[in-house]
Swiss-Prot record:
Domain statement: The presence of a 'disulfide through disulfide knot' structurally defines this protein as a knottin.
Protein species of origin: Viola arvensis (European field pansy)
Entry keyword set: Disulfide bond, Knottin, Plant defense
Protein name: Varv peptide F
InterPro entries, A to Z: Cyclotide, Cyclotide_moebius_CS, Cyclotide_sf
């Protein structure tokens, strides 16, 4: 839930390990 992945996922995919897509950004916990 914390947007600290430094990655966006406008295409719906996160490449950073442990991160999930909370469009349009990747979040962790």
């Amino acid at each position: 839930g914390v947007p600290i992945c430094g990655e966006t996922c406008t295409l719906g995919t996160c490449y950073t390990a442990g991160c999930s897509c909370s469009w349009p950004v990747c979040t962790r916990n």
